[in-house]
């Protein structure tokens, strides 16, 4: 049986992996977006665990809102990434130093 401790441990491990991905790789935009998505999913696991433990479905409902925001964030991030690659021919964060049009 999966307990709250198992879900919290999994959420903490995934959050730590995503945090390490953000801090260790600051050059590639795709890895940064994937790390942010993994961070949101680890928070969702914690919401589901607490919702299940307390018997309140509002935490699981909140997960759907987070997933919707995460999908919109990924779509906008990838659109910006495609535009950035078309104009600058790079996805390296270090080479993008200004937001001039």
From Swiss-Prot:
It is a multi-pass membrane protein. Belongs to the complex I subunit 4L family. Its EC number is 7.1.1.-. One of its GO terms (cellular component) is plasma membrane. It comes from the Bacteria. It is found in: Cell inner membrane. It comes from Stenotrophomonas maltophilia (strain K279a). NDH-1 shuttles electrons from NADH, via FMN and iron-sulfur (Fe-S) centers, to quinones in the respiratory chain. The immediate electron acceptor for the enzyme in this species is believed to be ubiquinone. Couples the redox reaction to proton translocation (for every two electrons transferred, four hydrogen ions are translocated across the cytoplasmic membrane), and thus conserves the redox energy in a proton gradient. This is NADH-quinone oxidoreductase subunit K. GO terms for molecular function: NADH:ubiquinone reductase (non-electrogenic) activity; quinone binding. Keywords: Cell inner membrane, Cell membrane, Membrane, NAD, Quinone, Translocase, Transmembrane, Transmembrane helix, Transport, Ubiquinone. It is an enzyme of class 7 (translocase). NDH-1 is composed of 14 different subunits. Subunits NuoA, H, J, K, L, M, N constitute the membrane sector of the complex. It catalyses: a quinone + NADH + 5 H(+)(in) = a quinol + NAD(+) + 4 H(+)(out). GO terms for biological process: ATP synthesis coupled electron transport. The chain crosses the membrane at residues 4-24, 30-50, 62-82.
